[in-house]
From Swiss-Prot:
It catalyses: L-aspartate + H(+) = beta-alanine + CO2. Belongs to the PanD family. This is Aspartate 1-decarboxylase. It comes from Streptomyces avermitilis (strain ATCC 31267 / DSM 46492 / JCM 5070 / NBRC 14893 / NCIMB 12804 / NRRL 8165 / MA-4680). Catalyzes the pyruvoyl-dependent decarboxylation of aspartate to produce beta-alanine. It is an enzyme of class 4 (lyase). The modification Pyruvic acid (Ser) is found at residue 25.
Length: 139
């Protein structure tokens, strides 16, 4: 049996562009891809914190150091420049691998620069006003 497990996320990234006329996908700065262990073409889920929209698409590598998080194609109807999003990837792994899997959590600033790396999916952004859910167990 394979389990689908949380593999990585880029937490609270700011959407820098959205264009209906681009080929559908999400363009992400190569520095963020490396930090989150994401590959071009990889399936990701995007959760829009600003409006609650959720979608899935695939990754296109963006210019390294640019801070780009660009929503392309039809998804631009749902996600807009300035929105805060969480970009999440999953992995299908064996039960033994699932029990040992340490996800990558990438916290970014308003310019989509990495400010902290971690493995706890419930950890709030360092230095923010966010709080850990009181019911969440520390990873």
């Amino acid at each position: 049996m394979l389990r689908t497990m949380f593999k990585s996320k880029i937490h609270r990234a700011t959407v820098t562009q959205a264009d209906l006329h681009y080929v559908g996908s999400v363009t992400i700065d190569a520095d963020l891809l490396d930090a989150a262990d994401l590959l071009p073409g990889e399936l990701v889920h995007i959760v829009d914190i600003t409006n609650g929209a959720r979608l899935e698409t695939y990754v296109i590598e963006g210019e390294r150091g640019s801070g780009v998080v660009g929503i392309n194609g039809a998804a631009a109807h749902l996600v807009h420049p300035g929105d805060l999003v969480i970009i999440i990837s999953y992995a299908q792994v064996s039960d033994a691998e699932a029990r040992a899997l340490r996800p990558r959590v990438v916290h970014v600033d308003r310019d989509n620069r990495v400010v902290a790396l971690g493995a706890d999916p419930a950890e709030p952004v360092p230095g923010s006003d966010q709080a850990r859910s009181p019911q969440a167990v520390t990873a």
